[in-house]
């Protein structure tokens, strides 16, 4: 009984303390794409003209489009699920990881809010959905992971990325 009271007390403190939080792991995320875009307002005002990395949105910097998978443990074996696309990009002098991350996130926010036009087959924006964009450094350059939780949206992201950069190499098989 004592243990139950301790757990219920801890749970009530955690839930009451996070009533105003925008994210709590035990509750579903109810934010809309517009809500998420507005969360970036302060960050994106500094780069309103997109001058930090003007070539970041060019299809020519994308060397390959690789389908991004996640391993989900289910039962004995597990399962691979499509999450989106990994866009491998050429390194350029004016495009470090942080600048590229902010440029792509602000582009998604601006298009979502109607402040910027959507590029043809834009892999960084999907109407009605918010894409998780994470830029990292690799041995060969930069990689922008454009991810979503919906399998249908993930498939659309891969298709749009391939059409956006048709000269880029397409890799669909999961990597070990």
Model-derived regions, located:
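Surface-exposed, polar/charged faces of alpha-helical domains
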Residues: 91-95, 113, 138-141, 145, ...
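Terminal, regulation- and interaction-focused segments at domain boundaries
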Residues: 35-37, 74-97, 145
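Bacterial Sec signal peptide processing site at the extreme N-terminus
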Residues: 15-36
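Short, solvent-exposed interaction modules
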Residues: 117-149
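Compositionally biased P/S/T/G-rich terminal and signal peptide-adjacent segments
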Residues: 41-81
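Mature extracytoplasmic domains of secretory-pathway proteins
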Residues: 88-122
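Sec-dependent bacterial lipoprotein signal peptides
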Residues: 1-18
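C-terminal partner/receptor-binding element of secreted or periplasmic proteins
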Residues: 43, 149-176
């Amino acid at each position: 009984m004592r243990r139950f009271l301790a757990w219920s007390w801890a749970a009530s403190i955690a839930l009451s303390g996070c009533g105003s939080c925008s994210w709590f792991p035990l509750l579903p995320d109810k934010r809309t794409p517009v809500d998420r875009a507005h969360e970036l307002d302060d960050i994106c005002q500094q780069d309103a003209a997109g001058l930090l990395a003007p070539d970041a949105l060019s299809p020519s910097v994308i060397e390959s489009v690789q389908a991004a998978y996640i391993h989900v443990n289910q039962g004995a074996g597990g399962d691979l699920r499509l999450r989106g696309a990994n866009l491998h990009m050429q390194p350029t002098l004016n495009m470090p990881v942080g600048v590229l991350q902010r440029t792509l996130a602000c582009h998604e926010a601006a298009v979502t809010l109607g402040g910027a036009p959507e590029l043809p087959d834009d892999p960084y924006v999907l109407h009605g959905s918010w894409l998780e964009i994470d830029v990292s450094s690799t041995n060969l350059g930069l990689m922008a992971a454009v991810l979503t939780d919906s399998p249908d949206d993930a498939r659309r992201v891969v298709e749009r990325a391939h059409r956006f950069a048709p000269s880029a190499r397409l890799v669909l098989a999961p990597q070990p």
